[in-house]
Design a protein with these regions (language model features):
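Short glycine/proline-rich turn/loop motifs
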Residues: 10-17, 190
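Rossmann-like flavin
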Residues: 1-4
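C-terminal catalytic lobe of FAD-dependent flavoproteins
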Residues: 167-223
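Generic, well-ordered alpha-helical scaffold segments in large soluble proteins
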Residues: 33, 37, 41, 80, ...
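Mid-domain catalytic core of redox enzymes
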Residues: 22, 52-167
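Conserved small/polar residues in nucleotide/adenosyl-binding loops
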Residues: 226-229
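Helical element adjacent to the flavin cofactor pocket in flavoenzyme catalytic cores
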Residues: 14-53
């Protein structure tokens, strides 16, 4: 409430509320189509290629240095990561004022979204062609997941476009805002190699999120085949 921008309000209103569009077959097809277009125009995509520095000439970023020592030269470099991390990769430069760099670096991070995916029994719940927002109380600004009480502040329920019979739900996504700080203890670990405490927390949050949604949509409980965080 104290820090949300006009952009946040516009995105929430026009994307999450008025424009709850869905893709039959999932959104991976968008990434696949983009990848195909890049290759069609002679482009190359590098995966597992960590960037360690952005090199500048004058007032422009002209090169990307990878961890394996390769240097990629380009007329235009687009960074889609946190601005503070982008500045760290650029390093000291007169182009970015020190006061601005420090201000960006001192801004508090916002929250992330914890997601749970529910596979449903076929032909049990009619397709829900809209987003549903469930709140724990009347104060809609208290939305963060309470890790001490193990309870969501709010949950967004969104049904994926069915792959089979369009009249029935087959997959439901639950999303709830959660602070990023509790996860910092595992920021150095890799997917598939997380400590037991990490997986235990995700399992507990998944169950709490599912329970929260089922309390407000009771018919969901008996239709669950599988849940996954």
């Amino acid at each position: 409430r104290e820090s949300s921008t006009l952009d946040h309000h516009a995105m929430g209103n026009h994307s999450n509320i008025e424009g709850a569009c869905r893709f039959t077959g999932g959104t991976q097809q968008i990434a696949d189509a983009l990848a195909a277009k890049i290759r069609e125009h002679g482009g190359t995509m590098l995966v597992r290629s960590r960037v360690v520095a952005l090199h500048t000439e004058g007032r422009r970023v002209t090169g990307v240095e990878l961890a394996d020592g390769r240097m990629l030269r380009a007329k235009t470099v687009i960074s889609a990561i946190h601005p503070a991390e982008t500045f760290r990769l650029i390093g000291p430069t007169p182009v970015i004022r020190k006061a601005f760099r420090e201000r960006i670096g001192s801004l508090p991070d916002s929250y992330g979204l914890f997601s749970a995916y529910l596979l449903l029994k076929p032909g049990r719940i009619p397709y829900i062609n809209r987003n549903l927002y469930y709140f724990a109380g009347k104060d809609v600004w208290k939305t963060l997941f309470d890790l001490e009480a193990m309870r969501p502040g709010m949950v967004l329920l969104s049904a994926q476009a069915p792959d089979g019979d369009p009249a029935w739900c087959d997959v439901v996504t639950l999303m709830t805002p959660v602070a990023t700080r509790p996860w910092e203890a595992w920021e150095g670990s890799a997917p598939g190699r997380r400590p037991e405490a990490y997986t235990a927390l995700k399992a507990a949050m998944t169950q709490a999120t599912v329970d929260f949604a089922c309390a407000r949509l009771p018919e969901l409980r008996d239709c669950l085949l599988y849940t996954s965080p």
